[in-house]
């Protein structure tokens, strides 16, 4: 980041909390913030990648705390709040929003769908409220919530996931309105297809002709650069695709995007 960018990010210090900060876009957020001089609390489920990212960030001379937590569990909320109680958190990034249960709705398990809701809504809301209150009192800070283009229309096997992602965008827009007069920035960073370990594990076909595949480092940089602008930024040059997904002819746009998704997943 340039010195100008560093100064912009420094207003969100001295500590940043990144939920989902071990790999992919989350790890790139961590590296950029460490370069800018922010201390970090990195939260993830897998200790191995978490430690690797933490050590990478320590090379920039910042303090890094690692916290292994299952963000689908309500116990994680109290654990995270307790582990950061002594810190002045000026930036909260919620990057933990994967689809943990990909199944057609009538065939899926409700308990598994509930975990998708808890990961993407329940835990996100609780932590956002906790850190957001302190930021509002200090009259400075930033909240960055990572969203998905899946939240712009319905999709087979993403019925619940698409719904929670739509919720996240509307939530961010409302929170942005509530906090903008308190000098607290709010942004939902909307991701399209991004070459992350999580998307690779799902088995996405990145070689579909015409598919736009974003780089995690560039996506993270876009998010930090647009944080002060809020409330929503579509990453990876996908703005035109998102506009198309808002077409009022819902049958046409949903069916058309479904065909593209089938190719992306190698199911056509």
Regions found by a protein language model. Give the residues of each.
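C-terminal helical subdomain
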Residues: 188, 204-245
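Active-site helix of classical SDR
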Residues: 128, 164
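Conserved mid-core segment of classical short-chain dehydrogenase/reductases
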Residues: 78, 82, 91, 97-114, ...
């Amino acid at each position: 980041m340039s010195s100008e960018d560093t100064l912009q990010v420094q207003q969100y210090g001295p500590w940043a909390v990144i939920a989902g900060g071990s790999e992919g876009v989350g790890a790139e957020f961590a590296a950029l913030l460490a370069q800018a001089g922010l201390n970090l609390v990195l939260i993830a489920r897998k200790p191995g990648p978490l430690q690797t990212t933490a050590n990478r960030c320590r090379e920039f001379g910042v303090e890094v705390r690692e916290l292994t937590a299952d963000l689908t569990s309500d116990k994680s909320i109290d654990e995270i709040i307790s582990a950061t109680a002594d810190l002045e958190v000026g930036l909260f990034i919620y990057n933990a929003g994967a689809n943990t249960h990909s199944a057609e709705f009538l065939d899926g398990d409700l308990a598994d769908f509930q975990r998708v809701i808890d990961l993407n809504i329940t835990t996100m809301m609780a932590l956002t409220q906790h850190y957001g209150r302190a930021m509002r009192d200090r009259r400075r800070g930033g909240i960055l919530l990572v969203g998905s283009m899946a939240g712009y229309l319905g999709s087979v096997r993403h019925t619940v996931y698409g719904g929670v992602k739509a919720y996240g965008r509307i939530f961010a827009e409302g929170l942005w309105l509530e906090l903008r007069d308190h000098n607290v920035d709010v942004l939902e960073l909307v991701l399209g297809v991004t070459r992350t370990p999580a998307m690779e594990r799902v088995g996405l076909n990145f070689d579909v002709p015409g598919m736009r595949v974003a780089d995690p480092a560039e996506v993270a940089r876009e998010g930090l650069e647009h944080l002060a602008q809020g409330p929503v930024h579509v990453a990876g040059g996908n703005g035109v695709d998102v506009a198309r997904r808002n077409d009022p002819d819902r049958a046409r746009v949903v069916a058309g995007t479904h065909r593209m998704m089938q190719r992306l997943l190698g199911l056509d």
